């Protein structure tokens, strides 16, 4: 039986459609993502915590879902908005339909609405809070009240909500089409010990670090710098994550302390913003953010343009950069800051997602630069695990 659903934005705009997930209500910031593929990776990306994701590509669900293409243990997005859900799924890796997957994870979703109209509205007015109600009792006024009552992401510390609760090792490399997910690598085959802060880390980031010889110790977001240093790392990674970086004072303080050492530091997405804040810069809320797999970014040092995957609603304010930070990358969509490098420390960061998943891998060389810094650190300090 077809069940109705409604999406109501905080400005009162209504979109009526069909429920394709769980019954109930979902409230969050409504954003749009322009990726054509990778909807399962998007749904399971912790950076989408407290957000309702609108996918602009018209057909979503064609290939179903499987047990491999996930970036975390569960669906992280608050809700899903799409144009059309195909009646059939067709892929040799399909284990479940998208609709069944959403219901199993209790995710409210709506289809059969004009996603082009919604996207244009979000571009013109900026990201808005919204509410999806699905099921038998559809009340637009209740949805509006819920949307307007949502406080918004600015000032909200979500990293401590999505982070791991305990330290764990990660030794698994990247997935291959022929063999699927590989077995964990042996520690003796991974010469570099990297401590990875989990602010909402995507699994593909961890896998790409392992591919380059890193054995990872993943630690909770609120782990102190002192506890990290006790682990004796060769490098420190600051992961992606959701929400506003400014309230994450515990992380900013930890990074400040870690910057007093000579241990290489690499940050992605939220980790990029935290490195900037710890260095004395400021961040700002964007109008509608960057979400998609087709964003052109210029590498200012190599003078090349790369197509990147992006997922963030906050950015580092370039005007606030101190003298010890140099700009390395900028967005060609809106000129916002995309990359920084400390001039006095082996620390750098990137706003986009070089691991993609989904998206292009044109900035994967950033992982290689991190390894170069680690090798230099190990050689300089005569550490036993130098290649």
From Swiss-Prot:
UniProt catalytic activity: hydrogencarbonate + L-glutamine + 2 ATP + H2O = carbamoyl phosphate + L-glutamate + 2 ADP + phosphate + 2 H(+)
Span list, region CPSase: 1-189
The organism's place on the tree of life at top rank: Bacteria
Active-site residue numbers: 269 (nucleophile), 353, 355
InterPro entries reported in the protein's UniProt record: Anth_synth/Amidotransfase, CarbamoylP_synth_ssu, CarbamoylP_synth_ssu_N, CarbP_synth_ssu_N_sf, Class_I_gatase-like, CPSase_GATase1, GATASE
Residues that, per the record, bind L-glutamine: 47, 241, 243, 270, 273, 311, 313-314
GO BP annotations listed: 'de novo' pyrimidine nucleobase biosynthetic process; 'de novo' UMP biosynthetic process; glutamine metabolic process; L-arginine biosynthetic process
SMART domains assigned: CPSase_sm_chain
A Pfam family this chain is assigned to: CPSase_sm_chain
Pathway this chain belongs to: Amino-acid biosynthesis; L-arginine biosynthesis; carbamoyl phosphate from bicarbonate: step 1/1; Pyrimidine metabolism; UMP biosynthesis via de novo pathway; (S)-dihydroorotate from bicarbonate: step 1/3
UniProt keyword list: Amino-acid biosynthesis, Arginine biosynthesis, ATP-binding, Glutamine amidotransferase, Ligase, Nucleotide-binding, Pyrimidine biosynthesis
E.C. designation(s): 6.3.5.5
Entry GO MF terms: ATP binding; carbamoyl-phosphate synthase (glutamine-hydrolyzing) activity; glutaminase activity
All copies of domain Glutamine amidotransferase type-1, residue ranges: 193-380
Description of how the protein assembles with itself and partners: Composed of two chains; the small (or glutamine) chain promotes the hydrolysis of glutamine to ammonia, which is used by the large (or ammonia) chain to synthesize carbamoyl phosphate. Tetramer of heterodimers (alpha,beta)4.
Entry-linked PANTHER family: CARBAMOYL-PHOSPHATE SYNTHASE SMALL CHAIN (PTHR43418:SF7), MULTIFUNCTIONAL TRYPTOPHAN BIOSYNTHESIS PROTEIN-RELATED (PTHR43418)
Family from the record: Belongs to the CarA family.
Known function: Small subunit of the glutamine-dependent carbamoyl phosphate synthetase (CPSase). CPSase catalyzes the formation of carbamoyl phosphate from the ammonia moiety of glutamine, carbonate, and phosphate donated by ATP, constituting the first step of 2 biosynthetic pathways, one leading to arginine and/or urea and the other to pyrimidine nucleotides. The small subunit (glutamine amidotransferase) binds and cleaves glutamine to supply the large subunit with the substrate ammonia.
Full protein name: Carbamoyl phosphate synthase small chain
Organism: Photorhabdus laumondii subsp. laumondii (strain DSM 15139 / CIP 105565 / TT01)
UniProt gene name: carA
